[in-house]
Amino acid sequence: MTNVVIDTKPVWGNMLPQLKWKDGTVVISEDDKHNEPYGIGKFFNFKEDFTRLYFKAIVNNPRERKTIEALISLPRSVADVCNPGGVYLGGRTLVDNVAKKFATIKASVDANGKVGYDTSDLERLGVRCRYYVDDLVKDDALMRRILLENKWKSKYPALVKPYEEYQRSKPKTIVLPTNRNNPVRSNVDIKPVNPPSSKVVKTVETDERLKDPPHTGALKTLIPLQKPIAPVQISEKPVVVKPEIKSPSKVIQTPDPQTVVAGKIIPNNESADSRSLFGSPVLLICVASLLLLIIIL
């Protein structure tokens, strides 16, 4: 497995776990090329483990006056700079023969108030970390820092090919057309099973036991797809067949409607004998006279 040794940029906070710091002053210079003081700042809220540091600097110069505040997270040890995935190989972490109680820090302040920290009267610290290539290319945070350098390929040539292979092997999100809301992570391309054609055929591979002796490969039969026939549903309950008895229908004859002409009833020829008895006016007069006589007596 290939190893890559990376010289990280100096981080002034690496010295804090090994130096007994208290509240002290900081000399801020305008940039790395100038040594004249740009402002005076002060450290506040030191903790024994030096993992969090509140830094407040008041910048005084003829052109501007501003207050810079920053909350800095510091590593517990120098070896934490190489984590995760790295092995600390050493480097200058302490300055020999430091007579001052408080180290002097210089920084460059831009127009927006951002401060870039660096050691001033101390020699630049080079922290060397060893990484395994397979683990290094998977460390997104560290790779982002390496990729910021324009000449990272020439500086770390052993990283080029493994990093490109890792990028190609990353799983990609494929959204199936059948369900757009369901992302499926896959490393292979999804292709249709049957290519589009005018005739849709289905390839069926026969069983090995059905092969003819002369043939060496499995038989392949082309069966055209047909529409499935709907099965006939058979009821499990017994069907009772009742014989149908036809009864003679009764014919109900209704009298034909009578024809009315000018207020007179013209009887039909078919019902003439049924109305002949009561249709005579002489008989009606006799019956009426008999009834009247009975009432009088």
Curated annotation (Swiss-Prot):
Residues 175-199 are annotated as: Disordered. It is a single-pass membrane protein. Disulfide bonds: none annotated. GO terms for cellular component: membrane. It is found in: Membrane. The chain crosses the membrane at residues 277-297. The keyword Transmembrane applies. Keywords: Glycoprotein, Membrane, Transmembrane, Transmembrane helix. Residues 176-185 have a biased composition (Polar residues). Glycans are attached at residue 269. Belongs to the ascovirus HvAV ORF18 family. This is Uncharacterized protein ORF18.
